[in-house]
C-alpha cells in the first residue's frame, strides 16, 4: 500500500482521506516515508482518488494544509517551555539598557542645574545617585528620577522571576551557575534546543562575540570566557588559570544543557560530581 497525504492507494484502488486541514497535517506527520520507493503524486491522482474535483480544488486544499502545518509549527515553537523565559531575559536586558541611559541623562541634566555637582559624585552607586537627584530636584527632572527608581524596582522583580523560571526550565544548568546566568546563557544561544546542541568550546565564549570577531579579524588574543565569567568560580579565579576554570565549567554546562532539554529534571548523580569538579577546578594548577 502506498500512502499519500490525500489518501491510500493499493492494488489500483484509492481511498481518499476524510478530515480537515489539521487532521491531514497530523496524518502527514505520522506517515512513514521510504524515499527509495516513494513516487510523488500529482493532482490527477488526487482527483482519481476522489479527494478533490479538479486541479483548482486540489491546489486550494493543498494550500490550506500548508497553512495549517505552518501554524502548527509556529504554535509548537512558541509553546516551548523556554519561549517565555527567552522573552523575559530579553526584556530584562532592555530594561537594564533603559535604566543606564536614563540615569546618565538625568545626571547630565542635574549637572547643568548644579555645576558644582562634579564627576566624583557619579562614582556613587546608581541607586543612590538617582535618589539624590529625585530628592533635590523639582519638576520634570524629579519625575524622571522617580520613574527610574520605579523601573529599577520592576527590574529587580523581573530578575527574581527570571531566576525562578530558569530553575524550572533549566534545572541542571541553573544548579551549576545560578538561574539568572543560566537564563542569559540560553537567551544568547537562542533557546534551549540551540544551547543543547552547542559544544563546550562554544558555550565557553558565548556572549563574547565582539572579542571573538576581533580575534578572528585582527588576531588579538582569543577570549577565554563570555557569559560564564559571571560565575563566581570563573571571575574569582586567578587570571593565569581563569581560562582552565572556564573550560571545566563550560564542559559541565554542555552536559547540563542536554540533560535539561532531553530530561527536563535535575539529575543529582550528575550535579554532585559536576559541582565538586567545578569547585576544585584550577586548584592543583594554582599550587
Q: Predicted regions span which residues?
A:
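N-terminal basic/disordered segments at the start of proteins
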Residues: 1-18
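Long, charge-rich intrinsically disordered scaffolds of nucleic-acid metabolism proteins
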Residues: 38-155
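Extended, structured, electrostatic nucleic-acid-contact surfaces
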Residues: 89, 156-175, 187-194, 201-202, ...
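Acidic, carboxylate-rich catalytic segments that either coordinate divalent cations
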Residues: 245-287
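Phosphate-backbone recognition surface of nucleic-acid-processing proteins
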Residues: 187-261
Amino acid at each position: 500500500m502506498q500512502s499519500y497525504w490525500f489518501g491510500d492507494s493499493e492494488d489500483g484502488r484509492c481511498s481518499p482521506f476524510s478530515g480537515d486541514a489539521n487532521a491531514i497535517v497530523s496524518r502527514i506527520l505520522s506517515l512513514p516515508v521510504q524515499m527509495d520507493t516513494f513516487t510523488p503524486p500529482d493532482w490527477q491522482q488526487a482527483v482519481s482518488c476522489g479527494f478533490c474535483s479538479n486541479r483548482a480544488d486540489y491546489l486550494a486544499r493543498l494550500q490550506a494544509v500548508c497553512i495549517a502545518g505552518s501554524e502548527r509549527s509556529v504554535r509548537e515553537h512558541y509553546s516551548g517551555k523556554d519561549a517565555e523565559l527567552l522573552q523575559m531575559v530579553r526584556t530584562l536586558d532592555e530594561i537594564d539598557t533603559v535604566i543606564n541611559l536614563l540615569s546618565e541623562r538625568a545626571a547630565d541634566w542635574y549637572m547643568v542645574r548644579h555645576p558644582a555637582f562634579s564627576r566624583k559624585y557619579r562614582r556613587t552607586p546608581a541607586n543612590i545617585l538617582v535618589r539624590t537627584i529625585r530628592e533635590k530636584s523639582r519638576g520634570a527632572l524629579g519625575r524622571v528620577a522617580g520613574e527610574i527608581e520605579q523601573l529599577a524596582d520592576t527590574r529587580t522583580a523581573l530578575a527574581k522571576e527570571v531566576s525562578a523560571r530558569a530553575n524550572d526550565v533549566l534545572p541542571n544548568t541553573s544548579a551549576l551557575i545560578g538561574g539568572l546566568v543560566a537564563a542569559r546563557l540560553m537567551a544568547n544561544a537562542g533557546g534551549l534546543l540551540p544551547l543543547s546542541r552547542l559544544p563546550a568550546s562554544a558555550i565557553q565564549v558565548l556572549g563574547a562575540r565582539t572579542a571573538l570577531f576581533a580575534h578572528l579579524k585582527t588576531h588579538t588574543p582569543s577570549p577565554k570566557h563570555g557569559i560564564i565569567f559571571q560565575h563566581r568560580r570563573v571571575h574569582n579565579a586567578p587570571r593565569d588559570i581563569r581560562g582552565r576554570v572556564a573550560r571545566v565549567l563550560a564542559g559541565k554546562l554542555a552536559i547540563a544543557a542536554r540533560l535539561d532539554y532531553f530530561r527536563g529534571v535535575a539529575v543529582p548523580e550528575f550535579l554532585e560530581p559536576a559541582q565538586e569538579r567545578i569547585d576544585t577546578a584550577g586548584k592543583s594548577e594554582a599550587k
